Regions:
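N-terminal, membrane-interfacial amphipathic/helix-forming hydrophobic leader that caps
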Residues: 1-80, 87, 113, 231-243
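Residue-level recognition of hydrophobic positions within alpha-helical transmembrane segments
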Residues: 6, 13, 21, 52, ...
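Residue-level signature of transmembrane alpha-helical entry/exit and packing/kink sites
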Residues: 10-18, 44-52, 87-92, 129, ...
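Hydrophobic membrane-targeting alpha-helices
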Residues: 23, 27-31, 35, 65-66, ...
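Transmembrane helix-loop-helix hairpins at the membrane interface
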Residues: 26-29, 130-243
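Juxtamembrane helix-loop-helix connectors linking adjacent transmembrane helices
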Residues: 36-49, 72-147, 243
């Protein structure tokens, strides 16, 4: 891969989502809640699906624009490669087999280690919202499928490598920040919760980073799986919403 001159943009994109989550949580707190800072921030934490939607819309616009600047089309990354369709389906089947132990066990085990009961961590994440907000939250899984993995793995990672970053380090960085952004969705200033959100997706994020570097044409399949995973979370908000 030809090494290009230093470009700050991919480095900023590593941090952008975390920053936007934090800012939008604060703005929602100011708009919806009154009282002291602690109650404002705590109340806004329940609205994290909306912060994700707002963040994803900004990131989607940036990605479309950045790809266009480079003479490419962002939406092309979601095209299925029909020439390798059967091979890619078998690869995704193998990935789904790993999804259980790598994707879900760290979540459950870290919650049990830090909180004693995984349900305690879940209760901090899934809180009642007004019905309209819970319904609007159904948009976040689809936006996540369009933005999250493409941003880190197909935009940032290749451009870090073009600047001379070693492939293993580019994979490690994008995998780490893909996981670490969850500290801010929502951000709750509790060391246990911060640790939980930092580590719960780390093995899964690194697996995604490795697979996406090896076979980036799997992006449309990853997008579908990602939407379905997040859709199950969005449905939980419907089950606890204020009617």
């Amino acid at each position: 891969m030809t090494q290009n001159k230093f470009n700050l943009r991919p480095w900023m994109m590593l941090l952008l989502r975390s920053l936007l989550f934090f800012v939008f949580q604060g703005l929602i707190g100011l708009a919806v809640f009154s009282g002291g800072f602690s109650s404002l921030w705590e109340g806004a934490a329940a609205w994290w699906p909306i912060t994700v939607i707002l963040t994803d819309l900004i990131c989607l616009g940036l990605l479309v624009s950045f790809y266009r600047e480079e003479g490419e089309r962002f939406w092309d990354i979601f095209r299925f490669d029909r020439q390798h369709l059967k091979q890619d389906l078998w690869t995704m089947l193998a990935f789904l087999v790993l999804l259980g132990p790598v994707g879900f066990l760290p979540n459950i085990l870290s919650a049990r280690w830090l909180f004693g009961d995984p349900q305690a961590a879940a209760d901090l994440l899934i809180r009642p919202l007004p019905a309209w907000a819970a319904v609007l939250g159904l948009a976040f899984p689809f936006l996540q499928g369009l933005v999250e993995i493409p941003m880190y793995m197909l935009y940032v990672r290749p451009r870090l490598e073009k600047q001379g970053v070693q492939p293993w380090l580019a994979v490690a960085l994008t995998g780490f920040f893909l996981s670490a952004q969850h500290v801010f969705i929502p951000f709750i200033p509790d060391p246990r919760f911060i640790t939980y959100r930092l580590v719960m997706f780390q093995p899964f994020a690194l697996l995604i980073a490795v697979v996406m570097r090896w076979r980036p044409r799997l992006m449309p399949y990853f997008g579908i799986v990602h939407v379905l995973m997040n859709l199950s979370v969005a449905v939980m908000f419907l089950l606890v919403m204020h009617i």
